[in-house]
A protein has these predicted regions:
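Surface-exposed, interaction-prone regions used to assemble/regulate multi-protein complexes
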Residues: 1-170
Length: 170
C-alpha cells in the first residue's frame, strides 16, 4: 500500500461506473475508514478503506489518494475511540477547474473532508498477515486482518479524477 501513496501505476484496468466513486460517490457507502495517512511535504493524503461491509465494491480494501492536497479535515464524535469503526453513510465528490473536494460522512458522527488537485481510487485485494495476534492484546485482535500501509496488496483496478479534466459521465 505504501508504494501506492507515491503513485498509482498506469495500466490498471478502469473501474466500472458502479465501482467508481468519481462517477457515483455513493459507491463508497458501506466502506469503513480504517486509516488516514498524510504526507504534508508531498501534498498527499491517503485514505485506506475496509470493504468487507461494502455491497458495491469488490476486493478487500481500497485506497483513496488525493494529491496536491491543500485541506484534510477530520471531525469526529467525542465518544469515539480507537475501537470505533467509521462506516461511510454518505459521500460527495465535487470538482471544478482548480480543485477536487471529497466529503465522507461516517457513523458514528464523523466526517472527513479532502481538497486537492487530483484523486485516485484503487481497489485492492489485500494479503494481510494471517498469524493471529496474542489474545492478551485487544487492540491487535480488533485490527487483525485489517490493512495498513505496510500490507501487501494486489491492485484490481483504478479510477482517476483531475481538477482540469471533464467530469466523468454516468
Amino acid at each position: 500500500v505504501r508504494d501506492l501513496l507515491f503513485g498509482v501505476p498506469s495500466g490498471l484496468p478502469p473501474l466500472a461506473d458502479t465501482e467508481d466513486p468519481f462517477a457515483d460517490a455513493l459507491a463508497l457507502v458501506g466502506a469503513q475508514v480504517t486509516r488516514v495517512i498524510v504526507d504534508i511535504p508531498a501534498g498527499v493524503v491517503g485514505v485506506l478503506l475496509e470493504l468487507r461491509q461494502s455491497t458495491r465494491l469488490r476486493g478487500t480494501t481500497a485506497l483513496l489518494r488525493v494529491t496536491g492536497a491543500v485541506r484534510q479535515e477530520w471531525t469526529g464524535s467525542a465518544s469515539a475511540n480507537r475501537f470505533t469503526a467509521w462506516s461511510i453513510t454518505d459521500a460527495a465528490v465535487d470538482r471544478d477547474l482548480t480543485a477536487i473536494r471529497i466529503a465522507l460522512h461516517c457513523l458514528p458522527a464523523g466526517s472527513l473532508h479532502l481538497t486537492g488537485t487530483a484523486a485516485d481510487f484503487v481497489l485492492l485485494s489485500a494479503r494481510p498477515d494471517r498469524t493471529p495476534p496474542s489474545s492478551t492484546d485487544p487492540a491487535a485482535l480488533l485490527r487483525f486482518g485489517v490493512v495498513d500501509e505496510s500490507t501487501v496488496c494486489d491492485p484490481l483496478g483504478a479510477a482517476h479524477l483531475r481538477s482540469s479534466a471533464p467530469f466523468p459521465r454516468h
